């Protein structure tokens, strides 16, 4: 999506008139979606930017045009500098705008078309090579009207790697470590993923320990862990229940 970088509230308001609302506002160099927020007006934008700069002076702030109603997906891959091996593509159940750590996600994707999957694979390989990645990389995508948009790329191990490795029964962290140490190239490492049906990533929340936390989900992460559930197919009652409630906690 269209984006820009600002260092003051005045710059943010000026850029917002070019990008258009709604906007995703996020400070640089944070984890877990800290201080990220979706804003829908100049007043909301100015207030949030001032709050960020008060607590994080001299930090750059990223503004992205928010794709309302988009699906979110992510791909994990290993790159050895010459070759890229995509180890998993996951599709979130909640719409884009919910932090990836707070979303239910399904491996492999449950309703992405072949064209969209091909684009995700192509973009993942091109980005991994362009960044000169040696090891693991995680890339998050938003999909709307069969167009694939890049949200962010993180050339590191993501929280999804253990989930994918357990789902497919493959030692991906071990493979990535060998690649990073220069002990092996991808073509020298075995790759035989297998899974019957689908694996569902289930976010775990600790609201009973933090009763005063706002339970509305958004771009700032609130989960404290995750679990895994295997289902035979998409007719499974658990998947149907989660899918039917995918918009339940999405804040206005």
Model-derived features with residue positions:
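A conserved helix-loop-beta module that forms one wall/lid of the active-site cleft
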Residues: 1-35
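ATP-dependent carboxylate activation and anion-phosphoryl transfer catalytic cores
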Residues: 21-22, 31-34, 39-252
């Amino acid at each position: 999506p269209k984006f820009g970088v600002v260092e003051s509230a005045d710059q943010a308001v000026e850029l917002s008139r070019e990008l258009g609302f709604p906007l995703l506002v996020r400070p640089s160099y944070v984890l877990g979606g800290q201080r990220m927020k979706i804003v829908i007006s100049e007043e909301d934008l100015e207030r949030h930017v001032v709050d960020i700069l008060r607590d994080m002076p001299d930090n750059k702030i990223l503004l992205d045009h928010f794709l309302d109603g988009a699906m979110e997906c992510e791909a994990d891959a290993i790159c050895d500098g010459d070759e890229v091996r995509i180890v998993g593509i996951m599709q979130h159940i909640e719409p884009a705008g919910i932090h990836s750590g707070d979303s239910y996600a399904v491996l492999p994707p449950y309703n992405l078309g072949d064209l969209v999957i091909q684009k995700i694979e192509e973009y993942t390989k091109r980005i991994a090579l362009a960044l000169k990645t040696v090891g693991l990389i995680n890339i998050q995508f938003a999909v709307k009207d069969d167009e694939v948009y890049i949200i962010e790329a993180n050339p590191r191990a993501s929280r999804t790697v253990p989930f994918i490795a357990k789902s497919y029964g493959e030692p991906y962290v071990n493979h990535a470590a060998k690649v990073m140490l220069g002990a092996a190239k991808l073509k020298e490492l075995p790759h035989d993923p297998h899974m019957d049906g689908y694996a569902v990533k289930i976010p775990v929340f600790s609201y009973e320990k933090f009763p005063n936390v706002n339970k509305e989900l958004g771009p700032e992460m609130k989960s404290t862990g995750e679990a895994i559930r295997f289902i035979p197919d998409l007719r499974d009652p658990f998947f149907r229940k989660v899918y039917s409630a995918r918009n339940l906690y999405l804040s206005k």
